[in-house]
Amino acid sequence: VGFKAGVKEYKLTYYTPEYETKDTDILAAFRVTPQPGVPPEEAGAAVAAESSTGTWTTVWTDGLTSLDRYKGRCYNIEPVLGETDQYICYVAYPLDLFEEGSVTNMFTSIVGNVFGFKALRALRLEDLRIPPAYIKTFQGPPHGIQVERDELNKYGRPLLGCTIKPKLGLSAKNYGRACYECLRGGLDFTKDDENVNSQPFMRWRDRFLFCAEAIYKAQAETGEIKGHYLNATAGTCEEMIKRAVFARELGVPIVMHDYLTGGFTANTSLAHYCRDNGLLLHIHRAMHAVIDRQKNHGMHFRVLAKALRLSGGDHIHSGTVVGKLEGERDITLGFVDLLRDDFIEKDRSRGIYFTQDWVSLPGVIPVASGGIHVWHMPALTEIFGDDSVLQFGGGTLGHPWGNAPGAVANRVALEACVQARNEGRDLAAEGNEIIREPSKWSPELAAACEVWKEIKFEFKAVDTLD
C-alpha cells in the first residue's frame, strides 16, 4: 500500500458514531468548546486523536501498527443545553493504551497535550468510566471504610476531626498540646494542615513525636482510639516514605498526603506502604481548584476523586455543601457516592455521565471541612451520613473557652444529631431545635451556639449543573 503523506481531517479517522463501546474501554466525557468555525465532529475527533494515537499529520509509521486496534474514538456528541457552541463529546479508549496500575499514565494520555490544543477554545474532562478490567490492576485504598471502623472501634456515626490552627507558626510542643486538648474533648482525629510539612519553626520529627504523645495521653484518658493525620508529604518520594516509616514506628494509626501537589506516583507508593504496614491514609486535595473550578476548562473533581480511589486513600476532602468552600449539593453527593459505593448508576442530574462498577475496590470516606460549625451539624449529618469525617478547624479552636470545650461542643452536637436521626426526626426541618435542646445542659455547646449563630457563607457555586 502506498503511503499518502499530508494533513488529513481528524474526523475521517477518529469520529466513529457507529462504534459500539466495549466493556473493557475507558470512556471519557469531555466538555468541548471549539474555536469559531471548527465543527463539533472535528473538535471531538481531534480530542480523541490527540489523547490517543494521532498527531497533526499522517506518518509513515502508521502503516506498522493497527490504528483500528489502538485509536481513541469519538463515538457520540451532544450539544450542551443553554450554551451556544459547546458540546459533550464522548470518547472511547482501548484498554491497551494504558499501563496497568498507573493513574499517572492514564492521565498523561487522557488529559495530557490535548488540553493545549489550538483548535479548541476550552476543554474539560467531566467524567471517566473506568472498566473493571482496569480497576483490577490497582490496589486502591489501603484499607477502606469497614476496616477503618473496625480498627478505630467506632460505629453508627460520622467521625469528628479538627485541623490545628494557626496552620503555620506553632512550635512542635504547642502544636502537640493543641492536638491533645481537642482529642481529650471528644474528637476522633486532629489534622496537620496541608501546608505543614517540615518548616524551620517545626521540623517533622519533632511534630510527630509530640502529636504521638498527645494521642496516647488522650486515649488513656478517654478510653477511645484517637488519631492525628501526620502529614508525610515531602519534597521527594524517599523522604515521604521515611516519614511514614517513622509514624509507623511510633504506633500511630494514620498518616496524610497532599495527593495533587505530591503527585499520583508518590501517592500510589505511599498507599502501598500504608496497606503493607497497617496505616490509614488521609488525603488532602490541595491544588484541586486550580484544575476543577472553571466550568468549561480543566477537569471535574469527580474525575480526580475516581483517580484517588484507584491510586489509594482512606479519606479525601470533598467539600461541605454548607461551609466556605465551593460545592453544589447534588454534584457533591454524586462524587461522594462515587467514593463510597461499589456500584453507581449513570445519573446526569448529579453530573454522573457513566455507570461505574468498582468491583469491590474498597471505598473512601469523604471529609467535609472548611467553614463549618455546630449549627451546620444537622445538615452535615443528613447530607453525608455515617461514613464521613466532619472536620471543624475554626469551629473547634475558635470556641471562646478554648480547644477542649470546642471539641466537647462538637461532640455533643453530633451525638444529638445522630440520636435525633435515629429517632426518626427530620434533621433538615428541626435542625436548630435539635442543637438547642442539648445546649441547655451543655454549657460548652451553648457558648459555641452563641458565637456562631449568624455566620453564613452564601455565594452561588461557580461550577453548577447545566
Curated annotation (Swiss-Prot):
In-chain residues carrying the UniProt-annotated modification N6,N6,N6-trimethyllysine: K4
Cofactor(s) the protein needs: Mg(2+)
Protein residues bound to Mg(2+): K191, D193, E194
Entry keywords, A to Z: Calvin cycle, Carbon dioxide fixation, Chloroplast, Disulfide bond, Lyase, Magnesium, Metal-binding, Methylation, Monooxygenase, Oxidoreductase, Photorespiration, Photosynthesis, Plastid
Entry EC number(s): 4.1.1.39
Known catalytic reactions: 2 (2R)-3-phosphoglycerate + 2 H(+) = D-ribulose 1,5-bisphosphate + CO2 + H2O; D-ribulose 1,5-bisphosphate + O2 = 2-phosphoglycolate + (2R)-3-phosphoglycerate + 2 H(+)
GO terms classed as biological process: photorespiration; reductive pentose-phosphate cycle
Gene Ontology molecular functions: magnesium ion binding; monooxygenase activity; ribulose-bisphosphate carboxylase activity
Record text on cofactor binding: Binds 1 Mg(2+) ion per subunit.
Role played: RuBisCO catalyzes two reactions: the carboxylation of D-ribulose 1,5-bisphosphate, the primary event in carbon dioxide fixation, as well as the oxidative fragmentation of the pentose substrate in the photorespiration process. Both reactions occur simultaneously and in competition at the same active site.
Family: Belongs to the RuBisCO large chain family. Type I subfamily.
Designated name of the protein: Ribulose bisphosphate carboxylase large chain
Source organism (scientific name): Justicia odora
